[in-house]
Amino acid sequence: MSNEKTNVAEFVSELQAGVFEQQIATAINSVAGATVEHGRGGEVVIKLKFKHIPNTAQVNIEHSLSFKKPTKRGSSSEDLTYDTPMYVGKGGKVTIFPQDQMDMLNPQAKA
């Protein structure tokens, strides 16, 4: 097994072409602000489901974001779900591009 690990920050930024990362930030801000304003707790849940794409070294990642924030008289919630296909490289490293893809700007470089 390789020592290479999935870069989590890069991984999250690639989900739904960066939109998912922005939605996480918005949910955190919204829930934290409402929690302070109303004095009751909130919740942000991120869920990842992996399914193999047959005959490839890829997985389809279903990524879900749900959050619940307190309001003046109760709470409000939202659920979002998207899919992003990604490559699985050596040791299970997950990336948006294959690890052995040639650098198109520098064909002499090693992958």
Question: What feature does the model see in each segment?
Answer:
Residues N3, N60-E62, D100:
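N-terminal functional modules and adjacent low-complexity/disordered segments of proteins
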